[in-house]
Amino acid sequence: MDNEPVEVKMLDNFFSESAVIAEMKTNSNLNLDFLAANHGITADMLEVYYKFSKFKYECGMYTEAETMLGHYLSVVQPHSASHLGALWGRLACRIVQAKWGESLEDLHAVKEAIEVRSISSVDQLRQRAWLMHWGLFVYMNRGAEGVEKLAYLFSEKASLLFTLILSIAFHASKTYNVTLV
């Protein structure tokens, strides 16, 4: 695009260098300090890059957005505020492109990110609900095997939830003298 921000052009050039990509894949210790010192990449530049990938997604440029989000995820720390959003974005890009294998990988990455993040129970529940929603697209397009995996995704926490509900119901019945059916 001719109207890409300068930061986006610089990062696109950075990510197009095969030696840089190879180094990033082999060295998991690359962080923003390293990128700033050795390549002049700052957090602000990455933020512009992330926002521009969202712009490309909103314009229907899913392949470009997916590529940009993949690059962004390769340098951003998993605990950063935008990491989960970038995972969701790449998942959405791959779903609308019907890339079911990659979508499944991203679905699991999102699930793992939800589980390890320190967020409120309500936010975690909301994220899991969205995970199930997007999971429908991924699993229903994988045939019978996908339906089985979807059922597992829905039931994975079900036994814990069922136990919790029964425990609360039992205590409530004793406290309020109610008979459980």
Outline where the language-model segments fall.
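Extended alpha-helical scaffold regions
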Residues: 1-181
